[in-house]
């Protein structure tokens, strides 16, 4: 029996996508001349901050984008503002280090008409320990530590809508409800696609509470509880057993989950490890990476169709 020929795909918007890729290399797409660079005076006791959160996030975005230490980041900011013709003061490396611990980085996203279809997955990212080649060649010389990044992506726009940053030992089940809580209540969620690690009562209950449909691979037996989450899961499990898992994946579009796995590669393209060593700066660094990825998506993405 001969194997079927592999599918062939074609990019339909190559001209605009090529222009978007060129724009990603421009430094000025990150600089908004209308941003509030200096922090407003709030009238509180103590010394007020000099720079706004937007200014600190912009400086740290340049740091993450070019993988620079803090001192080199401050020097590059001086050159960048001089090129733009802006006479703005630049925070030093000590200010960037302290403000990163308390920064709540903001990342923009695009909203589309209709229900929101979420793709959920997680990956590990290293912040301490030897590199892979050094560990394989010479052995592990010190303890290697990881953190876990949980993402929820919009299937229509490929923008990251929610992110959580946890220790490496934490599982996916407690985090899925927290990801759904980051979606505004007035925004309708259509489906939530995740792997079998989220096949838990807590996850199904959180999805049903948002009036969404769970597309999660089922690995266990039927639940005996009589609740909306259990009934929806049991019906899917019966359909999987009757028609087969391959048909269920095609019917529900479960294979779209591979797109969130590809987005993990985009996240690690900005660095296989995170530079910060403390949890709060690490969270800010991951959020800044998400902001960079969403900004790249806003410039333009490839539209690929199957031709054969």
Predicted features along the sequence, with ranges:
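Inter-helical turn/loop segments and adjacent helix faces that build the functional surface
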Residues: 83
């Amino acid at each position: 029996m001969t194997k079927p020929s592999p599918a062939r795909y074609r990019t339909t918007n190559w001209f605009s996508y090529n222009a978007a890729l060129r724009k990603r290399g421009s430094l000025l797409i990150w600089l908004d001349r209308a941003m509030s660079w200096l922090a407003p005076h709030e009238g509180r006791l103590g010394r007020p901050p000099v720079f706004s959160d937007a200014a600190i996030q912009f400086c740290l975005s340049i740091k993450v984008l070019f993988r620079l230490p803090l001192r080199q980041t401050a020097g590059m900011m001086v050159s960048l503002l001089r090129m733009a013709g802006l006479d703005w003061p630049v925070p030093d490396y000590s200010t960037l280090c302290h403000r990163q611990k308390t920064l709540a980085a903001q990342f923009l996203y695009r909203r589309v008409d209709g229900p929101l279809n979420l793709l959920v997955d997680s990956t590990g990212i290293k912040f301490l320990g030897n590199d892979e080649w050094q560990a394989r060649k010479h052995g592990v010389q010190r303890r290697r530590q990881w953190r876990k990044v949980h993402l929820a992506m919009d299937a229509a726009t490929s923008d990251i809508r929610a992110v959580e940053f946890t220790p490496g030992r934490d599982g996916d089940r407690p985090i899925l409800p927290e990801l759904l809580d980051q979606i505004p209540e007035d925004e309708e969620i259509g489906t939530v696609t995740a792997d079998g690690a989220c096949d838990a009562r807590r996850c199904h209950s959180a999805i049903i509470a948002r009036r969404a449909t769970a597309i999660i691979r089922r690995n266990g037996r039927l639940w005996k509880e009589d609740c909306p989450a259990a009934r929806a899961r049991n019906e899917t499990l019966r359909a999987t057993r009757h028609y087969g898992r391959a048909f269920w994946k095609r019917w529900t579009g479960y294979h779209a989950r591979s797109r969130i796995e590809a987005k993990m590669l985009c996240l690690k393209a900005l660095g296989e490890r995170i530079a910060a060593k403390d949890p709060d700066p690490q969270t800010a660094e991951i959020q800044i990476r998400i902001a960079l990825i969403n900004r790249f998506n806003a410039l333009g993405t490839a539209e690929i169709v199957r031709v054969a």
